[in-house]
Amino acid sequence: REQAKGKSQIKMMDYGTIFAGKTALEILRQMVGGYVRMNQQEQMLMFYKVIYSERCIQPMAAKIMAEETERMILATKQLFYAMEIHKILHFQDADMSAVSFAMTVHGLMDYGLDKQTGKYEAADRKKDLMDEYLKWFCEENAVERNCEDTKQRV
């Protein structure tokens, strides 16, 4: 994970710099895209395939998956707190929004991988579905509850 994180150039977040001149949608695309790229590296894909297949019978595999999910949720909470402070998005409950968002992104990634592995549908559809979700999420959590707000730049 740490090697994949390094290769994806994921580092400490300076939210002011990340947010500068970007819409909420652009920010979420950037953040989710980094996470997707990290997890699509060959070593990470192989690791996850093994962990996924073992987690229902091996406590250590389940623990690894739970810890990764907790890291993803924590990172999402931090992002959402920063987006709220910078008035980019507004959340009724930032913590639960982060859980919902992180789990949905994770589920969409899994869904896309399953379709790709099963040669059921092109991986491009996964990107379309993820982007549709990100657009919907921005509209639902716009500061003024106005779709146009997601187009405003910080």
Kindly label every feature range from the protein language model.
Residues 1-31:
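Amphipathic alpha-helical linker/stalk segments
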Residues 12-19, 49-54, 115-119:
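Short linear capping/connector segments at secondary-structure termini
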Residues 18, 32-40, 48-56, 132-137:
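Helix-loop "lid/cap" segments that line or gate small-molecule binding pockets
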